[in-house]
A protein has these predicted regions:
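N-terminal acidic leader/helix
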Residues: 2-23, 29
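Detector for the mature cores of small, proteolytically processed
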Residues: 27-90
Length: 90
């Protein structure tokens, strides 16, 4: 549970730093709290530095070491929606 709190606190700090919205969904099963990684949603716009954002998330995850997260960044580029996938594991 402590690692989960550390993750949420870190994500909150990242969302403030980058002026974005991060939504997470949690599940508690048999007394164990897990994060539904499919519901880690990041709402950002074209002014968001996605490389720095991903770097900050990777740094957070590397400190915690209990999570595997795949992040998909949706970025608008010249009125066209590009999807950038950044899978990484710790």
């Amino acid at each position: 549970m402590e690692k989960y709190k550390e993750l949420l606190t870190g994500l909150e700090e990242i969302s403030k730093k980058h002026d974005i919205v991060i939504h997470t969904e949690t599940q508690i099963e048999n007394g164990q709290t897990t994060i539904n990684t499919q519901a880690l949603c990041i709402s950002a716009d074209e002014k968001t530095n996605t490389d720095l954002l991903i770097s900050d998330i990777q740094e957070l995850i590397s400190r915690i070491k209990n999570f595997t997260i795949k992040v998909t960044i949706l970025q608008y580029n010249n009125d066209k929606l590009d999807i950038f996938k950044y899978p990484f594991e710790d």
